[in-house]
A protein has these predicted regions:
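Surface-exposed molecular-recognition determinants
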Residues: 2-228
């Protein structure tokens, strides 16, 4: 029996169900052509220098296929600041606020082929401040980003590209103010009727007005009247 060498790429993402977890099998572990966690996700700490154009090199190319950069100050109190490949350069959203996307070239300036670039704002690039970054690359079976325009109907279907049933999804209005709404399959199994508010401190709540009454599938999810 050959032991597993943990310094080698011997465990790909096998049937990982979005952010909900759940690796289903080891039958093909170690085969060529598989997707590995380090190919699509990187936790990367850095120390900023106050330079308004500091480049952070994570080694993860998000600019090509798309993805999300999530930054949090580790030294001082500060917001969780997010930029993704959909909202574009010099724009951001924060998880503690109901505000739509903001525009500020001193936070996360741009996503690059090797990481991202920050400005000198204290939430992302303050001099001598330590930060943590969480970097997600769009990849089937792991992570996807979808932008849609609501139609004010009681039930609107939104297509996604995961290729599997999502384990978790988050909704946030970009053009207007609106709470972050989060659904996760572990909150209440086999139903989308319960969720949490990311920018709040309350307990779970009924979500039929946000996520509709239809469970997500491998190709789409449903939003209710409050989120379209």
């Amino acid at each position: 029996m050959t032991p597993i060498n943990f310094h080698k790429k011997e465990k790909p993402l096998t049937s990982l169900v979005s952010l909900g977890g759940g690796a289903a099998g080891m039958a093909n572990a170690g085969l060529e052509g598989k997707t590995y966690v380090e190919d699509v996700y990187k936790s990367y700490p850095y120390r900023a220098n106050g330079d308004p154009t500091q480049t952070i090199t994570t080694g993860l190319d998000i600019s090509g296929d798309g993805g999300l950069v999530w930054v949090k100050n580790r030294t001082n109190v500060g917001n969780h600041t997010l930029q993704d490949s959909l909202i574009g350069d010099d724009k951001y959203i924060v998880t503690s606020s109901a505000n739509g996307s903001g525009e500020n070239d001193t936070r996360i300036k741009t996503i690059t082929s090797t990481g991202f670039q920050v400005g000198s704002d204290g939430d992302t690039g303050g001099s001598a401040v330590k930060y943590a970054s969480f970097n997600f690359k769009k990849s089937e079976g792991f992570f996807d980003l979808v932008e849609y325009t609501g139609n004010s109907s009681a039930s609107q279907t939104i297509a996604h590209g995961l290729g599997c049933v999502p384990g978790c999804f988050m909704l946030k209005s970009l053009s207007t103010n609106g709470d972050w709404r989060v659904w996760h399959r572990s909150i209440q199994p086999n139903t989308t009727q319960y969720g949490i508010t990311l920018n709040g401190t309350g307990a779970t709540y009924g979500t039929i007005d946000e996520f509709g009454s239809t469970d997500p599938t491998a190709t789409q999810f449903t939003v209710g009247g409050n989120k379209n």
